[in-house]
Amino acid sequence: GEIFDHHYVEFKYPSGAVIHSQCRHQPGTVRNVNEVLVGTKGVVNLSGNGVVKINDHNGSLLHKYDPKNDLSPYQIEHNKLFKSIRSGGQIDDTEIGATATMTAIMGRMATYTGKLIEWDNAINSDDNLVPENISWNTKPPVLPDQNGKYKIPIPGK
């Protein structure tokens, strides 16, 4: 009852780059998780099934990546980690991890509030989504009605 069955967020960056991020997970529908990056020379489409396509602005296919014969990104990440450990090096993904997490938080804020969210708004927000007191007896903030149905969430409300 507390999550939307679909989301759409448009991320705009200072460089002028735009990312359209969308997902749908409604029962009985085509499920879709997709990011589309729009740049000055073309469009990158990152589908949830791992296929990446790059097209110019006229729609001509410039590149198609199919991951069938490649290692998973998780394995690549582990290979880099193990190599770093063996060589005595270190991997510091702190900044990219924090930025990616903040991007997700901002996307969630925009989707649920229906408002434009900018970095400063989000980083200075005092929104708290966690109940004050959590115990095994804490009631969820939203409960179903007498028919077991939840109120439908509406952006901005």
Region locations from a protein language model:
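Contiguous beta-strand/loop segments that form the cofactor/metal-binding neighborhood of enzyme cores
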Residues: 1-53, 58-157
